[in-house]
From Swiss-Prot:
Subunit details: Homotetramer.
Catalyzed reactions per annotation: L-arabinitol + NAD(+) = L-xylulose + NADH + H(+)
Pathway linked to the protein: Carbohydrate degradation; L-arabinose degradation via L-arabinitol; D-xylulose 5-phosphate from L-arabinose (fungal route): step 2/5
pH dependence per the entry: Optimum pH is 9.5. Active from pH 8 to pH 10.5.
Name used for this protein in its record: L-arabinitol 4-dehydrogenase
Gene name, Swiss-Prot/TrEMBL: ard-1
Binding-site residues for Zn(2+) 1, renumbered to this chain: 53, 78-79, 163
Organism taxonomic ancestry: Eukaryota, Fungi, Dikarya, Ascomycota, Pezizomycotina
Outcome following mutation: residue 348 to T: Alters cofactor specificity from NAD to NADP
UniProt xrefs under InterPro entries: ADH-like_C, ADH-like_N, GroES-like_sf, NAD(P)-bd_dom_sf, SDH-like
GO molecular function: L-arabinitol 4-dehydrogenase activity; L-iditol 2-dehydrogenase (NAD+) activity; metal ion binding; nucleotide binding
Binding residues annotated for Zn(2+) 2, in chain numbering: 108, 111, 114, 122
EC class of the enzyme, as a word: oxidoreductase
Domain of life: Eukaryota
Length: 363
C-alpha cells in the first residue's frame, strides 16, 4: 500500500570511528511513497518520538557493548513510537492512522526460547539498533505489524517510554516483588527511576534508591516523595550495605533491583539484602566482575539477571493508560530530528542533568 509521505527519510548514524551524523536512510522516500519495500505482515511507521538510551551513546562513544560491535555505518535508536502511514495488504490488525509503540525486536518463532514464551532469548533475533541491525532513529521505518503495539490516544512521548518501562517491568516480574516488600533500587538513571515507580505501583515499601549523583536523587524524591534517597560514598561494599540498611530504618531489604551493572553496587546489594533475599541485576556491566561469594552463600542470597524483556508491552500500555505509572516528567530534553547531534551531546554530558532525551519528528 502506498503512503502520502513527503519528506526525505533521514537517520542518525555512527560508525567504528565513533563519528555521529545525519544522512539519508532506508527505506527511501520513493519506496515509502510507493510501498515497494513492504513485506508481508509489515507496516510503515512515521516515527514521531525516539528516546536516546545509554546503549546508543555507548555504541557511538565506544563502538561496542560486549560482543555487539559496530563494524560499519549503523543507525541508532530503539525506543520509538509513531504513526502508521502504510500497511501491507496482508495486515488486518493495524490500519493507516493508528498510533503505535514499536517493540524493537523481530524473532524467529522457531527456537526453544521462542517456543516456550521467552522470546527475549531468541537465538536468531534481530534487535533494532544492535549491530548489524539498523535502529529506529529514522523518519520512516518498515516493521512487522505484530511488533507494533497500538497506544490509542497516548502521547508519542509516552509511547516511546514504553521500551524502558518494559525493561523495568521485566525486572519486577522476574524478581517477584510483593506487596509490602522492602525494596532497594540501585541507580537513579532512567531505568532505575522507572523501576522505582514500578516498585511503588507494585506496593513495595519502604523504598530506598541509591546513586552517586545528588541531582538525580533529588529528582527521584520529586517524582516519588515516598522514596528514601541514599547517596553512595566511597566505602567498602560491606560498609555501604550498613549505611543502606540504616536508610531503611534498620530493615534489611527483601529485594535489591540493581540498575547500574557496577561491580561495587552489586556487591553492596548482596551485603545489604536479608537472609534469603534476592539481588536482581537489571543493569548492564563488564564482562567479568567480582562478587562477595561467601556472603551470598551463607545468606542464601539469590542472584538473578535480566536480558531485555518479553511479553511486557501490553502490560506497560495498561499501566500508563490507567495512571499507575507516570512517565511524563522523565523526559527532560526534546530535540527535532534535524538536531539529533545536539540531542546526543546533551544525553552524553552529565553536566546537563538530562534524564531522558527524546528526538522528535512531529508533523
Amino acid at each position: 500500500m502506498a503512503s502520502s509521505a513527503s519528506k526525505t527519510n533521514i537517520g542518525v548514524f555512527t560508525n567504528p570511528q565513533h563519528d555521529l551524523w545525519i544522512s539519508e536512510a532506508s527505506p527511501s522516500l520513493e519506496s515509502v511513497q510507493k510501498g515497494e519495500e513492504l513485506k508481508e505482515g509489515e507496516v510503515t511507521v512515521a516515527v514521531r518520538s525516539t528516546g536516546i538510551c545509554g546503549s546508543d551513546v555507548h555504541f557511538w562513544k565506544h563502538g561496542c557493548i560486549g560482543p555487539m560491535i559496530v563494524e560499519c555505518d549503523h543507525v541508532l535508536g530503539h525506543e520509538s513510537a509513531g504513526e502508521v502511514i502504510a500497511v501491507h495488504p496482508s495486515v488486518k490488525s493495524i490500519k493507516v492512522g493508528d498510533r503505535v509503540a514499536i517493540e524493537p525486536q523481530v524473532i524467529c518463532n522457531a527456537c526453544e526460547p521462542c517456543l516456550t514464551g521467552r522470546y527475549n532469548g531468541c537465538e536468531r533475533v534481530d534487535f533494532l539498533s544492535t549491530p548489524p541491525v539498523p535502529g529506529l532513529l529514522r523518519r520512516y521505518v518498515n516493521h512487522p505489524a505484530v511488533w507494533c503495539h497500538k497506544i490509542g490516544n497516548m502521547s508519542y512521548e509516552n509511547g516511546a517510554m514504553l521500551e524502558p518501562l518494559s525493561v523495568a517491568l521485566a525486572g519486577l516480574q522476574r524478581a517477584g516483588v510483593r506487596l509490602g516488600d522492602p525494596v532497594l533500587i540501585c541507580g537513579a538513571g532512567p531505568i532505575g527511576l522507572i523501576t522505582m515507580l514500578c516498585a511503588k505501583a507494585a506496593g513495595a515499601c519502604p523504598l530506598v534508591i541509591t546513586d552517586i549523583d545528588e541531582g538525580r536523587l533529588k529528582f527521584a524524591k520529586e517524582i516519588c516523595p515516598e522514596v528514601v534517597t541514599h547517596k553512595v560514598e566511597r566505602l567498602s561494599a560491606e560498609e555501604s550495605a550498613k549505611k543502606i540498611v540504616e536508610s531503611f530504618g534498620g530493615i534489611e531489604p527483601a529485594v535489591a533491583l540493581e540498575c547500574t551493572g557496577v561491580e561495587s553496587s552489586i556487591a553492596a546489594a548482596i551485603w545489604a539484602v536479608k537472609f534469603g533475599g534476592k539481588v536482581f541485576v537489571i543493569g548492564v556491566g563488564k564482562n567479568e566482575i567480582q562478587i562477595p561469594f561467601m556472603r551470598a552463600s551463607v545468606r542464601e542470597v539469590d542472584l538473578q539477571f535480566q536480558y531485555r524483556y518479553c511479553n511486557t508491552w501490553p502490560r506497560a500500555i495498561r499501566l500508563v493508560e490507567n495512571g499507575l505509572v507516570d512517565l511524563t516528567r522523565l523526559v527532560t530534553h526534546r530535540f527535532p530530528l534535524e538536531d539529533a547531534l545536539k540531542a546526543f551531546e546533551t544525553a552524553s554530558d552529565p553536566k546537563t542533568g538530562a534524564i531522558k532525551v527524546q528526538i522528535q519528528s512531529l508533523e
